[in-house]
């Protein structure tokens, strides 16, 4: 498929999505460090959790508004809020004011606004793609996001110390561009509803409050069993992925002996556990950026069932090795294997999600689906505690159980007879 054949909205949203992830990685990745420096580690933890909770509220509110009022309006509200709060944070961090409390308040509202806009962005991609184009679109989007995260983290790392106000100012300027692109270049894509009264309020119900409409809309999403299975699979998949910066990262820093990763004559590359963790993260990002589009071309004729089963299996196996191995080159090979599994699975899973989501409730579905990241963060954090009790092979076995559950959920969704039964019960 030629990229020029994609819907204009889609081309704009992919470009805008790259800039959004770049800015988010450039600034937000360092907010926990900023808060810890200003308020101490214990207080910073509570402040970050508060931001996460408000982000969940923003996601659900944005999902409801986008289905009720349209994608474009929701995007404009969210992106304008992000722009204004970045500007407020930049002013509050300047030498003329320097108010960490105002910076935090701006951060809080910023994450709410960004979360508010996110489901509308995801739903708009579904609105303007076809089942035939979605794997390519999601592959391109996945590649773009990883590239943006890599560059953003690099820029933020160099500019954070001594130039945080500049970072916030650049972010404010970037979000002006994003909001302007949405205002001038994006058209509304919300599908026309044939039965709006039934869609918004439920069949036969009188007009009620906004909260009742909100609850009824999400009740229908939670009753969709096939969607629930995919949500469980996505949550466990993300829980495994986050192990690298949680339990596995702790294990490598604590247990991995310093070793030569490469030796040529008298020259050698010697790494410890923390350095090995950085190399593994960089390897995963570089491989995704380098191989995502190639993987799409190579695997486009492979059946979805095979891609999802094999992808989940390779992904899980790679992380199981990371949980137990203390040999640098084995860890590097495991990272390659898990990245191949990731590239096989993720675009197909996203396309499958797009196919099962009803047009009238797309943003509500995407809002609930995006909560898998929040739940996975909690699971990954708990794994650090579990890992203090279980030996490394026990954690590897736990990852294996996660992987089996993922494949089981895929089987239930992809098997025609099982899928029909799920639809009948939904």
Question: What are the residue ranges of the model-derived segments?
Answer:
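Juxtamembrane intracellular "pre-TM" segments in multi-pass secondary transporters
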Residues: 1-7, 189-231, 426
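Helix-loop boundary and gating motifs at the non-cytosolic
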Residues: 2-52, 228-233, 237-266
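Central cavity-lining transmembrane alpha-helices of secondary-active solute carriers
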Residues: 46-64, 282-294
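Cytoplasmic membrane-interface "Motif A"-like loop-to-helix N-cap segments
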Residues: 68-80, 299-312
């Amino acid at each position: 498929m030629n990229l020029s054949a994609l819907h204009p909205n889609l081309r704009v949203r992919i470009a805008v999505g790259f800039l959004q992830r770049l800015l988010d990685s450039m600034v937000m990745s360092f907010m926990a460090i900023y808060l810890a420096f200003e308020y101490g580690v214990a207080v910073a933890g509570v402040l970050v959790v508060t931001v996460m909770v408000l982000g969940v509220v923003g996601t659900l509110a944005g999902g409801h508004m986008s289905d009720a009022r349209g994608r474009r309006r929701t995007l404009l509200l969210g992106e304008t809020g992000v722009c204004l709060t970045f500007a407020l944070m930049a002013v509050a961090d300047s030498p003329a004011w320097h108010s960490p409390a105002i910076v935090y308040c701006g951060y809080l509202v910023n994450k709410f606004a960004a979360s508010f806009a996110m489901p509308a962005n995801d739903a708009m991609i579904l609105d303007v793609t076809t089942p035939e184009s979605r794997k390519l679109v999601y592959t391109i989007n996945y590649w773009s996001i990883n590239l943006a995260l890599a560059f953003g983290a690099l820029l933020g790392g160099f500019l954070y110390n001594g130039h945080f106000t500049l970072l916030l100012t650049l972010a404010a300027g970037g979000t002006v561009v994003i909001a302007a692109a949405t205002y001038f270049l994006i058209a509304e894509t919300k599908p026309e509803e044939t039965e709006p009264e039934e869609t918004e309020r439920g069949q036969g119900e009188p007009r009620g409050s906004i909260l009742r409409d909100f609850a009824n809309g999400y009740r229908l999403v939670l009753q969709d069993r096939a969607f629930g299975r995919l949500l469980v699979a996505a949550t466990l998949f993300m829980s495994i992925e986050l192990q690298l910066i949680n339990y596995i990262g702790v294990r490598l820093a604590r247990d991995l002996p310093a070793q030569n990763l490469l030796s040529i004559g008298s020259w050698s590359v010697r790494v410890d556990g923390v350095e090995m963790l950085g190399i593994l993260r960089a390897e995963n990002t570089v491989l995704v950026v380098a191989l995502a589009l190639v993987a799409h071309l190579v695997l486009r004729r492979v059946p979805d069932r095979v891609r999802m089963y094999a992808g989940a299996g390779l992904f899980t196996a790679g992380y199981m090795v990371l949980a137990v191995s203390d040999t640098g080159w084995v860890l590097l090979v495991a990272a390659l294997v898990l990245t191949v599994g990731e590239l096989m699975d993720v675009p197909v899973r996203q396309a499958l999600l797009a196919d099962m989501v009803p047009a009238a409730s797309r943003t509500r579905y995407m809002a609930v689906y995006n909560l898998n990241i929040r739940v996975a963060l909690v699971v990954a954090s708990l794994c650090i505690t579990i890992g203090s009790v279980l030996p490394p092979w026990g954690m590897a076995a736990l990852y294996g159980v996660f992987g089996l559950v993922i494949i089981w959920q895929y089987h239930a969704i992809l098997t025609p007879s099982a899928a029909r039964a799920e639809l009948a019960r939904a």
